[in-house]
């Protein structure tokens, strides 16, 4: 699954996009062959690996590199010291780490539920449209590897390894801190030995070391937190943003933008989709297996209707996919909470709490994708309903290809 999904990404990036660029007269290789795999956060990792960190007192107005955690750019820098170019090093680390994460995840799920759910879990991880971030110059691969390894080690009562992997996860991303309450609550509830508590406190190791670095270099141990203000001025649940996204699906982006129903046909179309779905449910016994084809057709139709972004908000594209991935995954995690390891379930809920309280709706879908227990839950669902799994993965493959096209052109994705 890893190889096939990566081949799709490579084909779109290096075969399809050059043709699109030539016919559309756009530039996709300003810096080199790897530019299609380099966008947004990638630029910050390049700056850190080549020039180091920076920080200033005007952090509420100016973006500083210290907001990005060090393990990924540090790993790239180490490879650069032996002659490996930045792009090659960054891509090797992320892709190989993502592959290793899939292998670890497969073994963990297989030991709990058998081969079929393990296969579906890795399929969900590899074919989710946001698995694109496991192929480009981003931190997804490393974070997946360390967080999954930490959860699996703790679940298997390998507390030394749990502490080591969890410390590396917080050195990669601040969201790894969700492992701390997950380990502590699990240790308390399951009455685990003192070693489990030591593993819990080791989670903070990556953040503590980075804080010491910030204190020594910039005189501010929390510089990485303060620097976040340039990207977001508030925190908390972005209710207005999520409501706007929901309204994009229900009444259409054009009507949301103007603040009233200007395009009457979109709400009528949405109502027809809802009524059709109700009819499919009502006559499900008569329709039999044909019902699922009807639902899939309605899903594709609603996606085509709603995928337009707000003209005033470039971060508002694909609202239907984002809402289903984020809140659908949260509901599924709750429903599957007794079927996945307790420590994984607790970690998942704390990770959602962090992701949904950033004060923004942008990038939340990518943060949710990086919550390993979410894929665990999707794997269990698809193993139970494989025909739905095949349909969902086919759709995900299409979206993955479309996301590659957007990323290659430096359009906002997540």
Region annotations inferred by a language model:
Residues 5-22, 37, 180-314, 321-324, ...:
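Membrane-lumen/periplasm interface segments of specific transmembrane helices
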Residues 38-84, 238-250, 355:
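Short hydrophobic/aromatic helix or loop-helix immediately within or flanking a transmembrane segment
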Residues 61-66, 70, 74, 82-100, ...:
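Loop-to-helix entry region of an early transmembrane alpha helix in multi-pass inner-membrane enzymes
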Residues 77, 89-112, 275-280:
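Transmembrane-helix motifs of polytopic, lipid-linked glycan transferases
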Residues 88-89, 105-127, 144, 342-346:
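Transmembrane-helix signature of polytopic, membrane-embedded enzymes
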Residues 104, 124-127, 142-161, 180, ...:
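Specific aromatic-rich, kink-prone transmembrane helix
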Residues 113-115, 150-161, 187-191, 339-340:
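Membrane-interface transmembrane helices that cradle and orient dolichyl/undecaprenyl
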Residues 136-142, 364:
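Short acidic/glycine- and proline-prone juxtamembrane loop motifs at membrane-interface regions
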């Amino acid at each position: 699954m890893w190889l096939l999904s990566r081949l799709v990404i490579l084909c779109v990036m290096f075969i399809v996009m050059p043709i699109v660029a030539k016919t559309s007269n756009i530039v996709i290789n300003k810096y080199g062959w790897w530019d299609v795999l380099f966008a947004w956060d990638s630029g910050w990792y390049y700056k850190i690996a080549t020039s180091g960190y920076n920080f200033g007192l005007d952090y509420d107005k100016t973006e500083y590199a210290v907001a990005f955690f060090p393990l990924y750019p540090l790993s790239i820098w180490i490879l650069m010291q032996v002659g490996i170019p930045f792009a090659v090093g960054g891509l090797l680390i992320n892709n190989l780490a993502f592959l290793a994460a899939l292998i670890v995840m497969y073994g963990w799920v297989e030991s709990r539920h058998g081969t079929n759910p393990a296969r579906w879990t890795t399929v969900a991880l590899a074919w989710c449209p946001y698995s694109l971030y496991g192929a480009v110059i981003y931190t997804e691969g490393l974070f997946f590897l360390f967080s999954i390894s930490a959860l699996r080690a703790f679940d298997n009562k390998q507390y030394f390894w749990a502490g080591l992997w969890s410390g590396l996860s917080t050195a990669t991303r601040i969201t790894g801190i969700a492992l701390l309450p997950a380990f502590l609550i699990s240790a308390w509830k399951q009455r685990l030995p003192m070693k489990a508590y030591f593993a819990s406190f080791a989670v903070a190791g990556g953040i503590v070391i980075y804080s010491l670095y910030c204190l020594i270099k910039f005189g501010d141990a929390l510089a990485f937190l303060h620097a976040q203000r340039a990207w977001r001025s508030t925190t908390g649940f972005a209710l207005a943003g999520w409501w706007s996204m929901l309204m994009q699906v229900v009444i259409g982006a054009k009507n949301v933008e103007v603040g009233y129903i200007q395009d009457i046909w979109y709400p009528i179309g949405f109502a027809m989709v809802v009524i059709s779905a109700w009819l499919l449910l009502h006559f499900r016994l008569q329709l039999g297996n044909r019902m699922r084809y009807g639902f899939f057709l309605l899903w594709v139709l609603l996606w085509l209707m709603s995928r337009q972004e707000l003209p005033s908000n470039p971060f508002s594209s694909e609202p239907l996919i984002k809402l289903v991935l984020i809140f659908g995954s949260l509901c599924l995690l709750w429903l599957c909470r007794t079927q996945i390891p307790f420590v994984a379930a607790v970690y998942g809920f704390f990770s959602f709490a962090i992701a949904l309280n950033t004060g923004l709706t942008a990038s939340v879908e990518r943060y949710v994708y990086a919550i390993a227990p979410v894929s665990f839950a999707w794997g269990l669902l698809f193993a139970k309903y494989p025909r739905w799994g095949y349909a969902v993965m086919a759709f995900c493959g299409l979206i993955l290809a479309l996301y590659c096209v957007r990323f290659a052109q430096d359009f906002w994705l997540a």
